[in-house]
């Protein structure tokens, strides 16, 4: 079954904006994944550096804002020097297979219990590439996620989760479990994660991208250090990897 073949009823012949084109691509991927729980997708990498996908990724990264990474390049600076050139450079590097992510910049934010939560801030460039990759692979995993899962999911919200809890209470369910997995992001076993990703993705270039982000390292106090386990909090791709693990254990 070809992803490119067939037109969904009601869908326009041509999608005009990057957002519409990306949504059309995502719909095709989701439908294919939903139809077959065992299908592994192999032709994904070229879609990541499509112009419309990169433009939509930039729009989302810009909307999210955030600080600069280790290269000190800000969103504002990119806009001043030219977004089109910035994205063209990313596209060329990805197409040539020369993309290498930078280490994430370590920052700490206070937690309610007085402790500090470590965050890893990727460069804007890496956030755009991660967002582009997420746009392509997320629909595949979304087809597998549980209906009762609400965290970090498109078209899902905390309000919907609360409504589901209210409805469960009306049906006689009267227990709520509040749990926290200590050091979850820092202790994810990468090989386990990659095995889960490989269940749905066979495109080696996409698998390489994900592994590169996991192994990019952390810069703290001017020094770069390797990390042997975990995935940095703060990355665009991190919530998707988290959901993949939880879905597998559901």
Where are the regions that the model predicts?
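Short alpha-helical scaffolding segments that buttress acidic/His motifs in well-ordered protein cores
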Residues: 57-61, 132, 209-214
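Conserved polymerase palm-domain catalytic core
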Residues: 86-89, 93-108, 112, 136, ...
